[in-house]
Amino acid sequence: MRVLAAMSGGVDSAVAAARAVDAGHEVTGVHLALSRTPGTLRTGARGCCTIEDSRDAWRAAEKLGIPYYVWDFSERFQADVVDDFVAEYAAGRTPNPCMRCNEKIKFAALLEKALALGFDAVCTGHYAKVVEGPDGHKELHRAADWAKDQSYVLGVLTAEQLEHAIFPLAETPSKAQVRAEAEERGLSVATKPDSHDICFIPDGDTRGWLADHMDLDPGRIVDTEGNELGEHRGAQAYTVGQRRGLHIGRPAPDGKPRFVLEIRPKTNEVVVGPEQLLAIDVMEGIRPSWAGLPPREVAALGADPKARSEEFEVTVQVRAHGDPAPARAWLTRSEGTPRLHVRLDTAQRGVAPGQTMVLYQGTRVLGQATIDAAFADRPHAAV
């Protein structure tokens, strides 16, 4: 097959490209230039998308003896990821830009261009697994190394995208083995530190970055009764579950800390309260999609614009490296608009609108939806 290897400049994508070559594919390396100003970004452990990363990717491609190109996707990245990130925070939601990048850039714009140029598949260094299901369709599963598993951020992939995705690190037992293999292959990125932060906020200061990219007006911090407790420095820069940085002078009557419970962008208010009020057991999601074929309970709905599926058992994850929680899920449609509902067996805390919930059955990723509402439907203690 003709395979386009997305090379970020890190060790994972370099080893993935090398394994694609070993598998006998005709491999071409490509580095995506996502930043309009890569020279201003930090290099090293906390950044990516820098000029240094592009050079590291080129060195790896040269070592592997494969063609290498740099494609400028900065305008699309700005519109689909960065601008979306700002818009979501402005609306009081907490987005996941890495998932949006996979959805709109790596497995949409990149894959579209790759197929148009005659490539058969895109190869990346993600820790995830694509397998053929019993019905012959491709399925997305967790990687062998659950500590590094990235199936959560790939939950946005569609059935068609899975048909053209290759993840050579799927069965790798540990990151240490990837680094050892890179060392054996003579790849200079073998000891390069991982990047952990949002790539366009390499110093990790999300609040500071938002202050530079949107209007953050001071407003009231209130309790659930509407009593004013203090003043915030921009409601959109807070997130549900946050405890630090509230600057509330008046202590709670019980002396316990307060947490952000809700962001109200229309009134520019931040609502705070005790930890137990963070606990939720129901989540509702918009824009659901399925990684491969939908569950049979959903498929049974057909094209009915007003319907409710049967419930099906799942585990659900709301953070990239969060613990999967047992739950039951079902899909409803109202005037043709789908909405995913999840009822957790045990209450969870700190779930914010804008986050993504990814559904699993065993190791298989079923699909995902953007959380639109999260609330407590039955009494329970804080978790």
Curated annotation (Swiss-Prot):
A GO term for molecular function: tRNA binding
Subcellular location: Cytoplasm
Annotated disulfide bonds: 101-199
Main location: cytoplasm
Positions that bind ATP: 6-13, 32, 125
Biological processes, Gene Ontology terms: tRNA wobble position uridine thiolation
Site-annotated residues for Interaction with tRNA: 126, 355
Leading EC class: transferase
Keyword match Cell inner membrane: no
An annotated GO cellular component: cytoplasm
Active site: 101, 199
Region feature Interaction with tRNA, mapped onto this chain: 148-150
Record's keyword terms, sorted: ATP-binding, Cytoplasm, Disulfide bond, Nucleotide-binding, RNA-binding, Transferase, tRNA processing, tRNA-binding
PANTHER family reported in the protein's UniProt record: MITOCHONDRIAL TRNA-SPECIFIC 2-THIOURIDYLASE 1, TRNA 5-METHYLAMINOMETHYL-2-THIOURIDYLATE -METHYLTRANSFERASE
Entries under HAMAP family matching the protein: tRNA_thiouridyl_MnmA
Family, similarity comment: Belongs to the MnmA/TRMU family.
Function: Catalyzes the 2-thiolation of uridine at the wobble position (U34) of tRNA, leading to the formation of s(2)U34.
Name of the protein described by the UniProt record: tRNA-specific 2-thiouridylase MnmA
Species this chain originates from: Kocuria rhizophila (strain ATCC 9341 / DSM 348 / NBRC 103217 / DC2201)
